[in-house]
Regions:
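N-terminal glycine-rich phosphate-binding loop for ADP-containing cofactors
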Residues: 1-123
Length: 123
């Protein structure tokens, strides 16, 4: 059915049954938590693509900015990892993986970078 009703008057509205099937949790995450989960999941996917040789570091950054609208102020999905710092990024992803599952699993190449204090972009 989807999340919206499309009545004949043309004004879509949220489907009334949505709240019944997906009630709000009593405790909601903070804005910072939601932001981190969104940024980290996108950066992890870009890092996986780099690790698998699908895309270069520069192309991953440009693609994330122009392709899906990663916040330009953060420099791109890969640059964001450099900005946060690989060690901190990996530690926070490990915590997210514990709480939310495998989608936050860190690729081995990024874990190795974190252990040797490397960056994707040379300064």
């Amino acid at each position: 059915k989807g999340f919206y009703d499309y009545p004949t008057d043309g004004k879509k509205r949220l489907w009334p049954g949505l709240a019944e099937h997906y009630p709000l949790a009593k405790e909601q995450p903070t804005l910072e938590t939601v932001r981190n989960r969104l940024m980290y999941s996108q950066s992890l996917e870009a890092a996986r693509c780099v690790a698998e040789g699908i895309v270069s570091v520069k192309d991953a950054d440009v693609g994330s900015l122009l392709g899906w609208g990663f916040p330009a102020v953060l420099g791109g999905a890969i640059s964001y990892i450099d900005m946060v710092g690989a060690a901190r990024f990996v530690a926070e992803c490990d915590a997210l993986a514990q709480a939310h599952g495998e989608r936050f699993a860190v690729p081995d190449a990024l874990r190795k970078m974190a252990s040797t204090d490397q960056r994707y972009h040379a300064i």
